[in-house]
């Protein structure tokens, strides 16, 4: 269904389907014209790998990375300019040196896993990587994903960043900080009372 959707725009079945891939610590949710996923790590899995000088900045990929897609093209051509400290769904250290990966990343946390009834699901983990402690949980309901973090702590001076999404600009960016507004072109903004952002169908 996903290949047909990418190639010809064929709609997904209207029913939502949730799947927990327990051998790889991953959960997917898809329905008509959307796909979402979350990837975690545990002692049962290799989170990611860097071999043949590839994926050398992929350390954060298994630490709660999410994908949110409605067209399948959301991340096309982004990787040359991708900020590897801000992988969607992750809570990570804002230092490019902390993204470096060599060989296999083996999970060290006991608590990690998920549960699915085939329609909705939850996946979560509790871990400490690069001295950053975080509890992360991802709840999938219908066409929504709720990402929850707690007990986040880090003793060094680098910023700790929780990222919701990162893709190339495609159309208007609408946000609400008490009032609904449109982000102007070529702007860089920090908001303290942000309620929501809408861009690229999400």
List PLM regions with ranges.
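Extended polysaccharide-engagement surfaces of secreted carbohydrate-active enzymes
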Residues: 1-202
């Amino acid at each position: 269904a996903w290949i047909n959707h990418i190639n010809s725009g064929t709609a997904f079945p209207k029913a939502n389907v949730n799947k927990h891939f327990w051998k790889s610590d991953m959960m997917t949710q898809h329905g008509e014209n959307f796909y979402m996923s979350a990837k975690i790590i545990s002692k049962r899995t290799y989170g990611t790998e860097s071999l043949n000088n590839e994926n050398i900045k992929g350390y954060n990929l298994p630490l709660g990375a999410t994908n949110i897609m409605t067209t399948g093209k959301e991340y096309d051509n982004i990787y040359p300019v991708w900020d590897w400290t801000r992988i969607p769904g992750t809570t990570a250290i804002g230092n490019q040196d902390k993204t470096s990966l060599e060989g296999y990343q083996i999970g060290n946390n006991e608590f990690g896993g998920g549960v699915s009834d085939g329609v909705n699901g939850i996946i979560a983990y509790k871990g400490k990587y690069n001295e950053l402690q975080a509890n992360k949980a991802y709840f999938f309901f219908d066409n929504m994903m709720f990402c929850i973090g707690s007990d986040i702590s880090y003793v060094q001076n680098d910023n700790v960043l929780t990222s919701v999404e990162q893709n190339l600009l495609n159309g208007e960016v609408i946000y609400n900080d008490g009032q609904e507004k449109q982000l102007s072109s070529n702007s860089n903004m920090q908001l303290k009372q942000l309620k929501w952002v809408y861009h690229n169908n999400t």
